[in-house]
Amino acid sequence: MIDSEALESERVKLKRDIADLRANLNRKEQCLRELEAAIAAGEDSDEAEESSNDMPTPQTKLTNDDIARYSRQLILQDFGVQGQLKLKNSSVLIVGMGGLGCPAAQYLVAAGCGHLGLIDYDEVERSNLHRQILHSEHRCGMSKAESARIALLELNSHCQIRCHSRLINSMNAMHIIRPYDVVLDCSDNVATRYLLNDACVMLRKPLVSGSALKMDGQLTVYGYGQGPCYRCIYPVPPPPEAVTNCGDGGVLGAVTGIIGAMQALEAIKLIIGLGDVMSGRLLIFDGSSFMFRNIRIRTKRPNCHVCSAQPLITELIDYEMFCGMHATDKDNPLDLLEPDQRLEVKEYHQKLQSQPHLLLDVRPPAEFEICQLPRSINVPLSEILDDSYLKRFAKQLEDKELPIVLLCRRGNDSQIAVQHITNRFPAHSIRDLVGGLHAWTGSVDATFPIY
């Protein structure tokens, strides 16, 4: 018997794939045209840029164009011509051309930073555009570093920009960071934070660190003067299951804009020696109440493994192994359950979906409202962990034969939930849906929305 519903789903999937391929081809062709135009205008290729760590000869005077362009900051008493010259001869490396890196780069280039390095291994996606303001719809599929470079050169063609379209790691970090004066950590993962911290301490580079999640943001400067480094504050990385990035927790684009702009400001202050640097202090921004708090953080740790007088770590290590998580902002898939506690989406669709079962969606209510599987019941992970779900499902839990399936967006929170429920009800059949709703879209129903 022909399953017309399955055939229709496959037809829709193929049509969508073909449309995506055509759109991607158009984007790639547009990107190629822009790159060729940039090269024709005299921009160096990546290979030529990265073949040497030497920065151009320092400039000793401002041009008429400089004076006209930067006049509003030149007239600042604490900035002036000498400040602009320092900025013109400076070099800043931005790691991560996402929600923080884009506004930071934009303001540094606009202010007249002479040399900018951009690092990002990833490509532009549509889900980036609400906060990563240098990218555009027609550059989806393009390297983020290259996309940002195109936008930045339109803003200020006098800035020298190097693109590093790769993942920064223990093998290349020292070589990449060495020629720059200041490093901005605009990444979204713990492993990269430790990597940048250690490399910057070893190379004596100040590290301007920013982060943003949901409606909140933070900013500080590590490894500057007598201030602490990142390891002084966090000598041991958090467990992977305790880490939330903006892909999981969400973020409002304007929040990343605020923090990224402040990272640019701190970099400018470091370069020209303006004001008090945020070393030894942490700026906390609460976007919900629009409150800023400036708190003191601990001083240098005398026995810090990296920045102390007798460091135990004198060369870069394997940071993914050290942190137990990937050095990217992509999903770090958890592996908490035994194979018999996991259920593939195709198996669920073909066998269990038509049988009596309890399907619990452990996403927050806001995410459940976006999309949900038929017959799924929303029970947020927080309710499972505090056991408030027990009264709600007391009757179903009495039936040890009733299969219980838990799902989430990508298959991580559902594993945590299965672990918790299984500890209380070890005799029940409780499984999680591998890969969550993303796997459902990829393997079962191509029309189901992805977010």
Curated annotation (Swiss-Prot):
Residues 353-449 form the Rhodanese domain. GO terms for biological process: Mo-molybdopterin cofactor biosynthetic process; protein urmylation; tRNA wobble position uridine thiolation. PROSITE patterns: RHODANESE_3. Its cofactor is Zn(2+). One of its GO terms (molecular function) is molybdopterin-synthase adenylyltransferase activity. Its main location: cytoplasm. One of its GO terms (cellular component) is cytosol. Pathway: tRNA modification; 5-methoxycarbonylmethyl-2-thiouridine-tRNA biosynthesis; Cofactor biosynthesis; molybdopterin biosynthesis. The keyword Iron-sulfur does not apply. It comes from the Eukaryota. SMART domains: RHOD. In the N-terminal section; belongs to the HesA/MoeB/ThiF family. UBA4 subfamily. NCBIfam families: PRK05690.1 (NF004281). This is Adenylyltransferase and sulfurtransferase MOCS3-1. It comes from Drosophila pseudoobscura pseudoobscura (Fruit fly).
